[in-house]
A protein has these predicted regions:
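Boundary/linker segments flanking structured domains
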Residues: 1-36, 42-122
Length: 122
């Protein structure tokens, strides 16, 4: 992923240069008495909507973003799922409560869940 970048309009307009599908991660800092850590939210942006998707979070408590251009809508969903699992979902480093779902009309399945189910259900 590219970034992290400051989540401000001028930076978004500068670094988001392509109108292709993408996945993104926005982050905020959580603090405890002993340490601070990033907590984030994953999202996906269909063809040409990354700027708009990021800008809707400008007034939130998220402060930085990373993104990755991905070729094709199924690949966007696959990448978002992989990141969701790698970051531990809501029990880990994400605010996303729910596992990513494919867009309406997509028949793709999560590559991680599908792989795990295949191993346990021959």
């Amino acid at each position: 992923m590219e970034g992290p970048f400051q989540l401000v309009e001028s930076v978004i307009d500068t670094v988001v240069t392509r109108a292709t599908p993408a996945v993104f991660l926005i982050r905020r800092i959580e603090e405890t008495e002993k340490y601070a850590y990033y907590k984030g939210r994953l999202g996906r942006a269909p063809h040409g909507t990354l700027r708009q998707n990021l800008k809707r979070w400008l007034s939130s408590d998220y402060r930085v973003f990373c993104f990755e251009y991905v070729q094709g809508e199924n690949a966007v969903f696959d990448r978002q799922c992989m990141l969701w699992h790698n970051l531990g979902g809501p029990a880990g480093k994400l605010d996303n409560e729910q596992h990513p779902e494919p867009n309406e009309g997509q028949t793709t399945k999560c590559p991680v869940c599908f792989s795990n189910n295949s191993r346990h259900n021959p």
